[in-house]
Amino acid sequence: MAILSYISATSTTPPIPQDQSPNSRLPTKIILPNKKPEKWSTGVAPGEYGGPPTTTKLRKYWGGEKEDPITSTDLIWNRDFMDQMKKLFDDPNDSSLDPSPSKEKSSGFLSFSRVMSLDSMDVDLSKELASSSKSVVKNRLDTSKSEAKKQMSKAIVSPKWKLAPTRREQEKWDRATKAATGGSDVMFRELRRPRGDPEVQAAKDREQYFKLKNKIQVLTLGIGGVGLVSAYISYTPEIALSFGAGLLGSLAYMRMLGNSVDAMADGARGVAKGAANQPRLLVPVVLVMIFNRWNAILVPEYGFMHLELIPMLVGFFTYKIATFFQAIEEAISITTQKPESISPDTQASD
């Protein structure tokens, strides 16, 4: 078996060509650099990052270019203090050995830094105090003179006259005054109007009041009638009936209101009596109750027509429309009416 494996191995290897010999290749030449390779810094050598300094000279940490703190006389471990102490005892007047620096002279006429000079009677401060008092007096004189000059200049200046307004400005002012005091002008005009006999004037006012009351009631009835006919033509008979019920409530309300105003002629007692006997504020409540009971009882049992709440309320507020028309008529009559001429007596009183 070993012989067979050797024969198979030798037969499978390719033959070596005769033109190539084993010694025909030349060796590769390696050229090394002349410089030495740099090593990584370990922080131990002088000058390296984290290493010791390159020189052994002491560094000047404090004061920049000043003396070295190790050799200065301020440290307690200085060994050369004996010579300095001997010089201090031998010649105490030497200024070079004085540790305290010389102070500059304080500015001003009085030095508060030296407290002992104030307690001493030998120090004469009369000149400084006299000069300060003179300066204060001089400043006061200057201020008084300047104030006097200002007052004289104000007195000499000519008085300022108000300019007359232009026509447009006067019209604007008149309109603003009329808008602000329009009601007061009318009131004063009525007060200045000459009055006749009080009884005759009261009778005229009473007659005018009754005319106005009857006019408002007739106007309410007329507007309500027009609304009732319009509701009957445009809508259903049920809506017309509801509007008519509200119109009746409106007429009742106006009647009660007129009676309350009539009671004011008797004074406070009449006002209280009229307010108690004429509960006109309950009229809309009564209308709502009639609407509820009518639809709940009369409609299902007796077959009456159904009522609507909104037409009833519209018919009730018919008196508001009549009052509004009456107010517009009064405003138009006041604006179109020319103001009556004022008598000479009232003009003289003005």
Curated annotation (Swiss-Prot):
Biased composition (Polar residues): 7-26
Keyword Thylakoid: yes
Disruption outcome: Reduced growth rate. Increase in xanthophyll cycle activity and energy-dependent non-photochemical quenching.
InterPro entries: CGL160/ATPI_dom
Transit peptide extent on chain: 1-46
One of the GO biological process terms: chloroplast proton-transporting ATP synthase complex assembly
Name by which UniProt lists this protein: Protein CONSERVED ONLY IN THE GREEN LINEAGE 160, chloroplastic
Underlying gene: CGL160
